[in-house]
Amino acid sequence: MNVSKINSLVELYFKKKSKVEKKKPFLKWLKPNNNIEYTWEEVTEKIYKLTNQIKIMINEGDRVLLLSENRPEWFIADIAIMNAGGITVPIFTTYAENDYKYILKDCSPSLIIVSNDNQFKKIEKFIENKKIISFETIQNESIPLSVILKKEGKKSVNDKLNRSMPACIIYTSGTSGYPKGVVLSHGGILSNCEGAEELLQPLIKKKKPVFLTWLPLSHSYEHTVQFIQILIGAKIFYAESLEKLILNMNDAKPTIMTAVPRFYQNLFTKISINFQKQVGIKKKLIDQTIKLGKKLLKKKKLSFKEKVINFFCQKLVRKKIQKQFGGNLQAFVSGGGALDQNIGEFLNAIGLPTLQGYGLTEASPVVSCNLPSVVKVDTVGPPFRTNSVKIAEDGEILVRGENVMLGYWNQKEATDNVIKKGWLHTGDIGEIDKNGFLKITDRKKDIIVNHGGD
């Protein structure tokens, strides 16, 4: 599919849907006692019906607040909102009360979509006289999704959308004060999808793509990832919880998984503690696995003896580790903050390929990422072909391209402070090495996200 000729995220979904087998499994929530797996056909039917209901409740260009945990209905609602002519405003389920109050006032949504009573109660006092749709029945005069799905109606696709129009407003915490609403366009996210598809092509060719989603879909990184999943025709599993993530990986057997640096830090800590408990031949084999794995990562040649040792490391250590993560993992992709170089080297060395990338919400969000064929863990990889990166005289990383945000919602001055002559000033200091790989060396100011991707 030529993404550069796609006009909107809605068009991306429906064009892909027309090319895949309609009975092909698509979305599954790994919630206890939940065995429902939606096919592409079933998801599409739900999108049509929810679109019809939303159209009745909003005008073109209205904001629709989406507050829910990760689940198939989140995906369905996002596509339906845009198909109905609305702008999705996804928000975290973990915000403080003041943040909910501020965001609701700032974006002034015409419609609110919530998953259940737990989420509704977080915003209840701030949404007087607002129209509400709920995924589950709640203690309010909302329209439950189950009622909407019983209705028949048109099966229409919005062909009025174009790449320059707002697709979503994603609120980012920054470093101080209230969250800023980052307005991302259809074209900005599509541009990111195009860059990601080129990056992932070698992995897609090896195995049918399967993703396990656990990072909140309200996060710009995971929000864009769901459209990459559409583009490459992936099967998507929604994790039960962070605590059950490893168990869920055994169920989903993902081929690709995206996460922020905090996840990899925690993973590194847990595996390191386990390694430290080992003694004797096991400990020696583990040490050799790390040592030789790092050597291979840096494209250094192994001696004959080292090749023999590495053969056993692969069979007895790396294969066992890979099996704990479902056995099909081809790559972890780290984004939304800087990944420690030692952690990146360690994970790659023990058989968990980890590609470090760089981005920020204001860039839709990915700017660069390491390649599956060339991993340089001291860098964040080469910039996506779909955006331009240059280093300013003071060392600041500047980004230009369709992926750059339309601006901050209701904040022209703040927008003008970070976008100058078409270049997004990231607030990060960096350099580009002789191979064209971007390296982050310092931070000029706190525009970029932290290790948790916030």
Question: Where are these predicted regions, by residue range?
Answer:
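Conserved structural elements of the adenylate-forming
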Residues: 44-52, 182-203, 319
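Conserved pre-ATP/AMP-binding loop-to-beta segment of ANL
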Residues: 23-25, 152-171, 178, 204-210
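ANL superfamily adenylate-forming
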Residues: 118-163, 271-320
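Conserved AMP-binding/adenylation subdomain of ANL enzymes
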Residues: 190-213, 217-311, 315, 328
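Structural core segment of the AMP-binding/adenylate-forming
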Residues: 56, 83-147
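Conserved AMP-binding/adenylate-forming core of the ANL superfamily
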Residues: 26-58, 62-71, 75, 79, ...
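Conserved AMP-binding A3 loop
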Residues: 37-41, 167-193
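Conserved ATP-binding/catalytic segment of the ANL
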Residues: 383-450
